[in-house]
Amino acid sequence: MKKVAVLGSGQVGEVLANGFLKHGYAVMRASREPEKLAGWKSGAKGEAQTGTFADAAKWGEVIVLAVKGSAAEAALEQAGVANVAGKTVIDTTNPIADAPPQNGVIVYFTNANESLMERLQKKAPQAKLVKAFNSVGSGFMVDPKFELPPSMFICGNDAGAKAEATEILAKFGWETVDMGAVEAARPIEALCQLWCIPGFLRNDWAHAFKYMKP
């Protein structure tokens, strides 16, 4: 199993870090203030450690970017562009603005012709970014329980990295739908807005997307 670095001290980072541990991966979880993760480390089941963004990015063979969207570019800089070069970087982020939803629709700081993932890929051109885990709530990211296996839409420029992400997603209970290159992150990131609407309007957060064909 490869070593997985999870960058982020929030709920998404915790859920995914625990998911990787559950499925047998060694995990280093990272924060700007690693001491805040001491409680997580002491209770983690598996080969778990903590460190700074740079520590984790150097150590990890697969990187998971699990910070809020407004902090994503800074987190990538702190991780070190050289440290993520040539590695699969699973980008879970969405460009959510620091503003309240408008009639149930989350506000983004990007527009329809640009994605946050594209900004990140430009900042770290040698990293093999794959967009994933951004279109569902954290409670369903690992081993989701639905009537059918849900679909995770992914994209990225590197076929090998997407294959690696697909393998991880399969272990976590997901069907993967490859939507092509990094530009596809524009509509994939918008899926977060769509996913959240039933939650804001009807308090319905227990759902996921399914790609179906005849």
Residue spans for each PLM region:
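Short beta-strand and adjoining strand-loop segment in the mid-core
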Residues: 103-113, 144-160
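Nucleotide donor/acceptor-binding cores
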Residues: 2, 87, 150
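NAD(P)+-binding Rossmann beta1-loop-alpha1 motif at the extreme N-terminus of oxidoreductases
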Residues: 1-49
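Rossmann-like NAD(P)-binding element
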Residues: 41, 45-90, 94-102
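Active-site-lining helix/loop region of Rossmann-like oxidoreductase modules
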Residues: 150-214
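General beta-strand structural signal in soluble alpha/beta enzymes
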Residues: 50, 90, 128-134, 177-179
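Short, glycine-/small-residue-rich phosphate/pyrophosphate-handling segment
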Residues: 111-135, 143, 164
